[in-house]
């Protein structure tokens, strides 16, 4: 009876510095940094910044689903990146430090990520209403498209990302009612 193994290791000294300094970058040139957790590129790609680490338990899918639901994003246009090291912004609300553990990720971030997606949607709706010179109440969002039924106008998220960047964050909670959900059941 015999056994063998090949183990190869490497030391990458710059990895830690890179993790501390690199901020997630949205895929488009004119991005909407709606908040610390959601960016929208000029190309319409929604980048969700996850404060929880993906180690095979599906955290990235969970974070993306929460944001996509509230934003009413096209799932094919959603991606997830790891949050940079910043405990003040990305801490686990249950533990007080930036980390993942104790099966707490989705429970910990559920309301927070929903609010962040809703905030991004509200900023896009405000931008569309401003551009189309109409009321925000007349604007709808569905599957990554912003629409004004009365005029027949329609645009993707990316078309309003830069204008939404200058918008004011809505004072009231804009989260969707669960009856309107597509991804969360």
Show which residues each predicted segment covers.
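Cofactor-binding beta-sheet edge motifs in enzyme active sites
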Residues: 1-185
């Amino acid at each position: 009876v015999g056994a063998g193994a090949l183990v190869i290791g490497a030391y990458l000294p710059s990895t830690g510095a890179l993790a501390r300094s690199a901020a997630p970058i949205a895929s488009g040139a004119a991005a909407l940094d709606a908040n610390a957790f959601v960016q929208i590129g000029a190309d319409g790609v929604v980048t969700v910044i996850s404060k929880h680490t993906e180690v095979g338990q599906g955290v990235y899918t969970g974070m993306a689903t929460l944001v996509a639901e509230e934003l009413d994003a096209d799932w094919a246009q959603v991606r997830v990146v790891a949050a940079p090291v910043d405990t003040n912004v990305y801490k686990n609300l249950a533990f007080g430090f930036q980390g993942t553990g104790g099966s707490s990720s989705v429970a910990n971030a559920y309301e927070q990520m929903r609010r962040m997606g809703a905030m991004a949607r509200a900023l896009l709706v405000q931008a569309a209403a401003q551009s189309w010179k109409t009321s925000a109440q007349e604007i709808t969002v569905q599957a990554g498209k912003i629409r004004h039924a009365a005029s027949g106008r329609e645009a993707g998220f990316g078309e309003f990302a830069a204008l939404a960047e200058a918008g004011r964050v809505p004072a009231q909670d804009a989260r969707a009612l669960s009856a309107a959900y597509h991804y969360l059941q």
